[in-house]
Amino acid sequence: MEKFVTLTSTVVPLPIQNIDTDQIIPARFLKAISKEGFGNNLFRDWRYDKNNNAISSFVLNNPIYNESKILVTGKNFGSGSSREHAAWAIADYGFKVVISSFFADIFKNNAMNNFVLPLVVSETFLSQIFESVNKNPKTTLTIDLENQIINNNSTRQLEKFIINAYKKECFLNGFDDIDFLLDKKYKIEEYERNCEY
């Protein structure tokens, strides 16, 4: 996987609370077993009408956000069923980071396992991001994973975030769980050589 050290991107603002996994990826699209293609149906029922026409008022249909790698959402994102497909859809669409003031635990773990960084911020900082993007849709955020800081480049406001040390190392090195173990192989072998049974 690609290493994640820093990211600067415009953001997609979705100031809706309690977005559940069925809204992220409706159940009728869960039949596929490959992770690819799920991005096409991310927020499907909000993006398209019953005739499959794009709903112009929905934020993902605004061309100004086509290159955005950061999704900013309301509180309690990813609640509902534990479907990993929700994380697949977000990753396949191209998002690298999701920011909220609270995530459902299972979604948060699924996101990290699919190399999407879920970052928890204060309600105050979240509101400031939405306000900045409302004033200027080209507002960018910089995610500094090494120092665990989010920088709102429009206002220069900073917010520290917390991340599990193991997951942080995986993101910084582009490792999944297997890659992490393989990287430690020499230490494991050294331990086995020196271990007295």
Curated annotation (Swiss-Prot):
Superkingdom classification of source: Bacteria
GO biological process: L-leucine biosynthetic process
Cysteine disulfide partners in this protein: none
SUPFAM superfamilies referenced in this protein's UniProt entry, alphabetically: LeuD/IlvD-like
Uppermost EC category: lyase
GO terms for cellular component: 3-isopropylmalate dehydratase complex
UniProt key word Lyase: yes
Pathway(s) where this gene product acts: Amino-acid biosynthesis; L-leucine biosynthesis; L-leucine from 3-methyl-2-oxobutanoate: step 2/4
Subunit structure: Heterodimer of LeuC and LeuD.
Family to which this protein belongs: Belongs to the LeuD family. LeuD type 1 subfamily.
Descriptive protein name: 3-isopropylmalate dehydratase small subunit
Native source organism of the sequence: Azobacteroides pseudotrichonymphae genomovar. CFP2
